[in-house]
Every structure is written in C-alpha cells, then in structure tokens.
C-alpha cells in the first residue's frame, strides 16, 4: 500500500536523522517551510508551532546561571527562526507560537524576549491557551489585554490549580490525577471562559476557537460532546449598535451650546 510504503520511508528517515543532528535540523526547517506553503494552499492565515528550547533547562535560577546565557540562547533561537518566519511571510501566514511549559516561549516575558531578537518580525504571533497559564499562576485575563494584537489562535482548554501543603506548581512528579495543577474537560475546571470570550471579542479576535481536550478524569467522548456545545454557548455575536442608540437625538453646534448653557 502506498501509505504503508510512505510511512516506512518516514521511519527510515527518522532513524537517519536521529543520528545526525545537522540533517535533523535541515529536515525540520524544510518541514516548516512546507507547512507555510500548505497553510497558504489551504487558505489559512495562521499556523501554530512550538518555539523549541535552549534555555528552558535553566528556568529555575539555581544553580546560578552564567551571565549572558539567556541572552545568547534567545539570540540563537531568533537566528534559527527568522528565515522560517520570512518564508511564512512570503506565503502570507502568521506563525503562532504556543506559549507552553518546556519551551523557551512559556510566558509573556519570554515572548517579548524572542520578539525583540527577531527585530519585531511581523509574523511572530501567539497561540493563546489559558490552561497553561493557570497552571503557572499567570493572569490569563490581563494577558489578553497586553498581547491581544499578537493572539491569532486560541485553544479552548480548561484546567484547575489546587495547591496543597505537599505540592504546588511543580507537581511533585505526581500522576495527572494527583497533581495540584491538572487539565480538565471544558466547564469542569476553574478558567473563566466567559471573560476570555468577552475580551477576545472586545479586541476583535476573528480566529478559530479550537477545542483541546486533555482531561485526566472524564472520557474523551463525553468531553468532545460537552465541549463543542460549551464553545458554541460562549461564542458572542458582536452587536452592530450600542444599547442606548435609541436615545440619540442627533447633535449640532448650536444644540450643544444650548445644552451647556452657552447660548
């Protein structure tokens, strides 16, 4: 079968690249460039990716980091991504970095570091997923206020954070069910999606609201059934007029002066 043959070829190439970091990097760059073209061909204007990680292993500041380590890491990250960003620009597609633990772009400050190193490349955008913010105790609502111009993709995923005297953000290597921070099915967690949808609508977000499900308790079938309805119930139909338009009697300079007692 052609698909089996193709899959076999992929596995062989993966083994080859696994032993050759340079070839692996070249292959990965080519895949992203192809993804830019594929997105254009599909009529998409945004594509999601992870940033990768040079300095994530040093996210905790002890042992003390050498001066310049973080700066050098982000310079190299931007150096590798800039040609790819240029390719996405040629194809008219934004590249949205999912702000995610394990990646160098894991919060607002790291996103800003990267953006600066790319010289504010116009295709550097963001995928917004509040579940990754609540688990690190980042204010996911004010994040929208700050970065709404960059948010072009949206994962609708719920989560909860219930710290105890035994574990907090780091989780103590516990299984998902026993972690203080864990992903939940939509509506079962702590995330304020009414406020999120309101803010995104307020700022004119016109991308997809994509259901992402990773609950450690509920079945995926139930999560999908409930989640699709949850999203539909939260999507806001934007009003074309203000609530008090009915009271507008018009205005002119003479009328305004009369109201102010200047006539």
Where do the PLM segments sit?
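A short, acidic, flexible beta-alpha connecting loop/helix-capping segment that sits on the rim
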Residues: 210-220
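Short amphipathic alpha-helices and their capping/turn segments at secondary-structure boundaries
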Residues: 30-46, 139-152, 194-202
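Single conserved hydrophobic/aromatic residue that forms the stacking wall/gate
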Residues: 1-7, 11
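Acidic/histidine-rich catalytic cores of soluble enzymes
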Residues: 72-190, 239-243, 256
């Amino acid at each position: 079968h052609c698909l089996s043959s193709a899959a076999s070829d992929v596995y062989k190439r993966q083994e080859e690249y696994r032993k050759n970091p340079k070839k692996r990097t070249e292959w990965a760059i080519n895949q992203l460039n192809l993804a830019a073209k594929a997105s254009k061909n599909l009529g998409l204007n945004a594509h999601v990716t992870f940033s990768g990680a040079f300095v994530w292993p040093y996210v905790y500041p002890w042992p003390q980091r050498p001066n310049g380590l973080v700066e050098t890491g982000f310079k190299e990250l931007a150096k590798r991504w800039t040609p790819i960003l240029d390719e996405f620009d040629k194809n008219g597609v934004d590249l949205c970095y999912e702000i995610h633990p394990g990646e160098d772009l894991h919060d607002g400050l790291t996103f800003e570091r990267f953006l600066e190193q790319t010289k504010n490349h116009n295709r550097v955008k963001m995928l917004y997923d509040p579940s990754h913010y609540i688990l690190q105790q980042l204010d996911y609502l004010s994040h929208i206020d700050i970065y709404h111009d960059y948010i072009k993709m949206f994962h609708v995923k719920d989560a909860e954070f219930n710290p105890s005297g035994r574990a907090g953000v780091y989780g103590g290597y516990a299984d998902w069910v026993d972690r203080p921070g864990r992903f939940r099915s939509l509506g079962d967690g702590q995330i304020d999606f009414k406020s999120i949808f309101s803010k995104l609508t307020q700022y004119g977000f016109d991308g997809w609201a994509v259901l992402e499900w990773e609950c450690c308790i509920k079945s995926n079938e139930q999560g999908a059934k409930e989640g699709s309805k949850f999203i539909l119930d939260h999507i806001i139909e934007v009003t074309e007029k203000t609530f008090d338009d009915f009271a507008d009697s018009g205005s002119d300079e003479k009328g305004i002066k009369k109201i102010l007692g200047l006539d």
